[in-house]
Amino acid sequence: ISKPTIIPVEPNKPVVSKTIESQPKHFIKRTVAIGRFTNETNYGKGFFDKSSEQGIGRQAMDILSARLAASEKFIMLEREDMDLINSELEMNNLGNLNIAADYLILGSISEFGRKTTGEVGVFSRTKKQTAFAKVNIRLVDVATGQVIYSEEGSGEAFSEAGTVLGAGSQAGYDSSLNDKVISVAISSLVNSIIENLTEKPWRSYILSIEDEVIIIAGGKTQGINVGDSFNI
């Protein structure tokens, strides 16, 4: 009998619009920040809390931030550890970091749980552990405070082990299922988040006007090239 294996149950992936599939290589990145990602369930209260580095809310935030950054379509701004960043800036006699995001992501884990089932035969016994989660996210336009998109994603993962005539693996509590199911639930939303953010028109702010020269926020790191023109 083989050792227990974790099997993520992948949800149906959101359909990516033709607009996203046909986007040109020249793409201006949006500036995005994840404002919060909280655990609103009763699971793990007192241990999986915001102050814990192992909290599932913090874990969900890290996974989502990593997935969006990997898409190379956004400039991700750190918000959760802003105090640490500002402390480092102060040590170098630099001012606090004040960069506003174009869009803010607010999220929560609305459902999280586990169950264990088993089957006992004449010569065999199996044990199956299943974890499931649901996450909710909202996209907020920082300039207007308007919620422009919201969606719920879900995920499931399980591990199974068995014995035959007393031989085989004994399955204890599999804590790694918690990590896997959160990752699956977040993954079910990533395509839709990217699609909705990239469909919004890029905008910037006028920093200064000198004679007939207008200086705006943005640059090469966002994908702006020499010769690009914009509507005001």
Where are these regions (language model features)?
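A structural "domain/chain start" motif
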Residues: 1-75, 81-85, 143, 151-156, ...
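Active-site-adjacent mobile loop/cap segments within catalytic or ligand-binding domains
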Residues: 163-166, 171-174, 178, 189
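Amphipathic beta-strand/beta-sheet edge segments enriched in Tyr/Trp
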Residues: 102-163
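Beta-strand/loop-dominated core regions that host nucleotide or nucleotide-derived cofactor-binding catalytic loops
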Residues: 230-232
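Short, structured interface segments
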Residues: 177-200
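Acidic, serine/threonine- and glycine-rich low-complexity intrinsically disordered segments
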Residues: 150, 159, 164-165, 187, ...
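Extracytoplasmic/periplasmic, Sec-exported soluble proteins
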Residues: 26, 52-60, 96-97, 101, ...
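Short, solvent-exposed, polar/charged sequence segments at loop or secondary-structure edges
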Residues: 52-57, 62, 69-122, 128, ...
